[in-house]
A protein has these predicted regions:
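A short acidic, Gly/Pro-enriched loop at the edge of an enzyme's catalytic core
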Residues: 103-112
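C-terminal lobe and adjacent flexible extensions of AdoMet/dcAdoMet transferase-like proteins
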Residues: 207-270
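Conserved class I S-adenosyl-L-methionine
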Residues: 1-52, 55, 59, 144-174
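Short alpha-helix
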Residues: 191-208, 214
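A short glycine-rich, Lys/Arg-flanked "PGG" loop and its adjoining helix->strand segment in the class I
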Residues: 128-140
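Class I SAM-dependent methyltransferase SAM/SAH-binding core
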Residues: 55-100
Length: 270
């Protein structure tokens, strides 16, 4: 993974911790926890790959899992360690690159989260290598949740978040396809790759995983940030119900292909 990605997360460790508390991202967080509870084994050893400041590591530790957090950012790992200490929880912390999962023993983990690296690795061969190594460190029939950024969802979100793009028709139409942004191509983010549902499925299946299901993390509420912010202020109970129901229905096919984040639930071969 590039130094640009590492620097971004070193510089934005606290922001990344807070991100999952914002009005829109609470749905992403709830959907991921829904998938963990639905598909992960009830106990075992879990690797949170690219898990940043440890929001999911905390939830895994709370549920009694033996959790390992791997992240490229030393600042994120420091923050995760302090947060778990405050809560009296334990986990293993490793500063490392998702491109080098072969540092772990084969068949070590019962399940894994791969929630960020696949949209920060530009080269398709490098992404394939990550998936192959992920498959290797999982036990037979091990479960993983793999996240991608989705152009098909971002075309809707962009109406609010980056409307200046839409002054050029070519940029608008480009959001129907895979996109890469190297270096500082995105002024308020870092180097990243945006996939499509079709491309992500092909990439995962090429690596030999069985796709059990996939979800749109934002569900039916994808792209609706201003309305969600308004609802959370004017009717907090209704907003809470939206978060819960969007998470519970995140696998419905009529929504999942048009959300910012795609979460694939996969199984390693026997």
């Amino acid at each position: 993974m590039s130094q640009a990605v590492k620097k971004y997360y070193d510089d934005h460790a606290t922001q990344e911790w807070e991100r999952l508390d914002n009005i829109r991202c609470k749905i992403e967080f709830a959907s991921t926890l829904h998938l963990i509870e639905k598909y992960f084994p009830k106990q075992g050893r879990i690797c949170d790959i690219g898990g940043g400041p440890g929001r999911y590591t905390i939830e895994l530790a709370r549920r009694g899992y033996q959790a390992t957090l791997l992240d490229i950012s030393e600042e994120e790992i420091k923050l995760a360690g302090s947060r778990l200490d405050e809560l009296g929880l334990q986990a293993e912390f490793i500063v490392g690159d998702a491109c080098h999962l072969n540092q772990f023993a084969l068949g070590l983990f019962d399940a894994a989260l791969l929630m960020g690296p696949m949209y920060h690795v530009i080269d398709s061969q490098d992404r394939h290598r990550i998936l192959i190594q992920l498959k290797g460190i999982l036990k037979p029939n091990g479960i993983a949740i793999i996240a991608y950024l989705n152009s098909w969802g971002l075309i809707r979100t962009g109406i609010v978040d980056f409307p200046h793009w839409y002054k050029e028709k070519s940029k608008l139409s480009s959001l129907l396809y895979e996109l890469t942004f190297e270096g500082q191509a995105l002024s308020d983010f870092t180097e990243c790759y945006w996939s499509t549902p079709e491309a992500a499925l092909q990439e995962i299946q090429k690596a030999g995983f069985k796709v059990i299901s996939y979800a749109g993390a934002e569900g039916f509420a994808g792209g609706l940030r201003p309305l969600l912010e308004k609802l959370s202020t004017e009717d907090p109970e209704a907003y809470t119900n939206v978060v819960q129901f969007a998470a519970e229905t995140c696998e419905l096919k009529q929504y999942r292909d048009s959300t910012d984040h795609l979460h694939f639930v996969v199984q390693s071969p026997v």
